[in-house]
Amino acid sequence: MIRTLVAAGTVVALAMLGFAGVAPPAAALAGDTIVVTTTIQAAIDAAQPGDTVLVPPGIYRESVLVSKSHLRIVGSRAAVIDAEGFRTGIRVGTGRISRDGPSPACPPFEVEGFTLSGLTIKHASFSGAFLIGVDGYRLTGTRYVDNPVYGPFPVCSRKGLIDFNQVAGGGSAVGPSLDTGIYVGDDDQVTVRHNSVTNYVIGVVVENTIHATVQNNLLQGNTAGIYVAVLPDHPRPFTDDVVVERNQVLRNNLPNPVSPDSGDEIGGVPTGVGIVNLGSDHVVVRHNRILGNDSLGVIVLQNLFGPIDARIEPDPDFNQVRGNVLLQNGQHPDPVRAITPGADIVYDGTGTGNCFADNVFATEFPAGITALFPCGD
């Protein structure tokens, strides 16, 4: 059923125009379809759980809040949320991370089931799509343009899929991009696949998260490609069980626009980095192409933030780097931020159970380090 405030003839016209190739999931048939006629927010306010909000092509100058379960927002990329002047393009969930106790805590799950399919989101000052306290979500097929801090940004959520998105930062309308294209923080059971990210400080971050997969993405033209990391002052003080596979991590040599003296961790990211494992456990980096990153290809190292947060166990344990092609990395390391000489593979020797196998590479630091830590199978 289609519910709208306009005449039935207009509904037929909207159904015929502008939506080729954009269809809600089959499960959406269980609810109504609401066609946006004024603002996206008005349609969401009128929706009930199970409904699909269909967004016609056009420019929507607004920020959207979703606090209901089982909603779908669907449209072509010609449907544009221009969030200039707002922190977020779309926010799902109203909770916040509590800092009232001895440690930070995620909010309870508030929204069960959310899908964003298609659309373009641009110019949000903080993030294109911010999710918090969401149990089950999919962010798919969206174009994120010139959102200077984050594109998709799910935190304290679980059972998520982020796929087939195009995330590009650095537009002149809002200045340089200052953080991460796709950020996953304090999440559980998340897959990030078939996305392209360019012109951010970091392409994809998996931080303080468990049971995650990052696969078949294109990370090109960022300062760094992929970070799997543990940062201080988060609800979850560790990252565990992450697979990073079959990604193209190419020429991420964008100069970091954040000063290393800014006091922000992002300012310490060296220009020209492929994949980083910073103090995370059970991370498998396999079958990636990591080429032409000026400072380094892949690095496994001890967490630098242990002294800041006593809950963090700093060593990277039981990690594997295997079957990757790493070439022409480390040839022009960042003269200010680089913490090691340039190389295709860097390992600081800390932790337990880390290993390397079947990689194609030319340089490593320290020399001969990977032969000292072979994988047993």
Report the location of each language-model feature.
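Extracellular parallel beta-helix/beta-solenoid repeat domains
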Residues: 31, 35-377
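Secretory targeting and sorting signals
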Residues: 1-28
